[in-house]
Amino acid sequence: MQPGGDMSALLAQAQQMQQKLLETQQQLANAQVHGQGGGGLVEVVVKGSGEVVSVAIDPKVVDPGDIETLQDLIVGAMADASKQVTKLAQERLGALTSAMRPTAPPPTPPTYMAGT
């Protein structure tokens, strides 16, 4: 075994994991999720970075005398999209970070002394 061989392998593995993490973060930032409010009457599309891509509003909810309902539906759709981004991040990053966690070493068996 070469001196530092294990350390070199660990360093290379850490660099690979860091690269995968950066790639996953970039994918998440560009991923698009859909959020809905009012059972689909308002839909927003948001990137993982938080950028709002689009808002679609069903004409049925456009009532000049009741702007508050429309505002509530938009807020609900945005909140739903935010939850979708969080869920997507947990799914993608969770798998990656679980692969990075070190496994616990096996427990050492108890030692017995003769005559005790």
Curated annotation (Swiss-Prot):
Gene Ontology molecular function, alphabetical: DNA binding
Highest taxon in the source lineage: Bacteria
Matches recorded under Gene3D superfamilies: Nucleoid-associated protein YbaB-like domain
InterPro entries xrefs: YbaB-like_sf (IPR036894), YbaB/EbfC (IPR004401)
Organism expressing this protein natively: Mycobacterium leprae (strain TN)
Residue ranges of the region described as Disordered: 96-116
Subunit organization: Homodimer.
Function: Binds to DNA and alters its conformation. May be involved in regulation of gene expression, nucleoid organization and DNA protection.
Pfam family, one: YbaB_DNA_bd
Entry's Gene Ontology cellular component terms: bacterial nucleoid; cytosol
Entry's localization field: Cytoplasm, Nucleoid
Membership in a protein family: Belongs to the YbaB/EbfC family.
Descriptive protein name: Nucleoid-associated protein ML2330
Keyword tags: Cytoplasm, DNA-binding
